[in-house]
Amino acid sequence: MLTLKAIRGRASEAGLKSLADCAKYARTLTFQRKMTKALDRLETFFSVVKNPVVSCGGGKDSTAVAILARQVSPHVTIMCADPPNPLPDREEHVKELLRWLGGPYVRIPYPWDVEKVLAGEEAYPEGLKIRVLSAWQKEHGVDGVVLGIRAEESKRRSLAVRSRGAVYQMSGGWRCLPICDFTAEESLCVALMSDAPINPVYTRQDGTLDFNRIHDGTWWPHDGGDSLEWMRTWYPDYAGLYAQALAVQGEGCAPICVF
């Protein structure tokens, strides 16, 4: 398990320098002010909902909001969506993170036929994850969801955050984006300062790759760009699958994000 203590002792090793820098930044007044604002947003959200959940799949952003949400509402349920095509170290990390977080959680698979999509026999199930989670939320009377959405990730998300704000209501209930103004590094800071388990994928890039572009869940293209060389370097067994997926989906075609 990668934690702050381990990073402090191994900061000179490949892939850990930028994480060590994050740990230093986490002690600054600027970061502490952002943390206060994020917690204030959560306080507002929890004051208007009765049966909320926190969406957390083990990535840096969802880990950050899970940690912060549990500070405000210790018994809020963690909702974890499980893809059929995870990277090899995701499962162990998610289990470790959920153990560390403690409290109630639910894991919800959203299966689709990866082989048929790669073969071109079926279309990529755009929006399946959202549909499955929405159905589960409706079935269980969920009236609000905390999400690890950040404006920095894309122009689409930036515009959405600007128009809706950090706490808003949709037809399916309330939404809270406590870290919408955080950078990727600031998201990691939350986990670092809590000494929470950190997805090992963040040590596999020698401190040179933008944290916004790292694949920390599945190997399917998701960033509107081409991470094939990164896959070849850090997950060579999955590079071929990623290349097939690029050919099926098309380079530069990022999945539509609805939140």
Model-derived segments and their meaning:
Residues 1-259:
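Nucleotide-activated chemistry modules centered on ATP-dependent adenylation/adenylyltransferase
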